[in-house]
């Protein structure tokens, strides 16, 4: 496989792509939350009580999401930032980077689709007063956590698109926070729905 050094064009493309991609991600969630709260004035982002486990999950995820966005934006204007990311040059090949970009696009597009399919039932975090009913149809017939699955796919893609110590740390922490959040949500749903959730978990996998 030819290395990226043989084609500086893909480096510049990836640099711009990542900045645009994470700007779109930030814009999507910002617009979605604003529009949703206009339609129904309720809290949609529920990190939990301050310093509890789910609160730490949310804060850690927000920190890394903001860090990723800022790094990708600044890389467009300051190429020397790459020197501090500790790049894995052996992974900087066209097939790997294009695979990463493809996974990022696929993961994000599927995240949007799942979000839209949930309508006003979507929440970020655990609603102490809900949900009123267990969602088992649509994408939830195939995965108990379709949005988290799509986010994980996109995170893996980010590492492949920009293979470095920085993206590896982001991937590792990101997957850990997703897993911790899943465990907390499963515990909450088990208390709410008991037998119904037990039957659901027996027939549908946590991931896929």
Residues of each region from the PLM?
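Kinked, hydrophobic transmembrane alpha-helices enriched for aromatic residues
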Residues: 146-156
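Active-site-proximal inter-transmembrane loops
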Residues: 125-148
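Membrane-anchoring alpha-helices and their flanking helix-loop junctions
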Residues: 1-129, 133, 155-188, 192, ...
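Cytosolic histidine kinase catalytic core of two-component systems
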Residues: 147, 195-196
């Amino acid at each position: 496989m030819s290395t990226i050094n043989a084609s500086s064009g893909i480096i510049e493309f990836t640099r711009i792509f990542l900045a645009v991609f994470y700007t779109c991600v930030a814009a999507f969630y910002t617009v979605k939350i604003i529009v949703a709260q206009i339609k129904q004035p309720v809290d949609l982002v529920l990190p939990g009580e301050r310093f509890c486990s789910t609160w730490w999950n949310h804060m850690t995820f927000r920190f890394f999401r903001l860090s990723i966005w800022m790094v990708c934006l600044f890389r467009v204007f300051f190429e020397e930032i790459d020197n501090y990311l500790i790049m894995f040059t052996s992974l900087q090949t066209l097939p790997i980077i294009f695979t990463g970009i493809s996974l990022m696009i696929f993961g994000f597009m599927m995240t949007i689709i799942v979000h839209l399919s949930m309508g006003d039932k979507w929440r970020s975090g655990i609603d102490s007063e809900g949900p009123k009913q267990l969602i088992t149809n649509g994408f939830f017939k195939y995965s108990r956590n379709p949005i988290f699955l799509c986010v994980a796919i996109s995170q893996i893609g980010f590492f492949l698109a920009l293979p470095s110590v920085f993206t590896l740390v982001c991937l590792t922490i990101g997957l850990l926070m997703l897993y911790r959040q899943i465990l907390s949500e499963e515990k909450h749903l088990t208390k709410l729905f008991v037998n119904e959730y037990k039957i659901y978990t027996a027939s549908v996998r946590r991931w896929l």
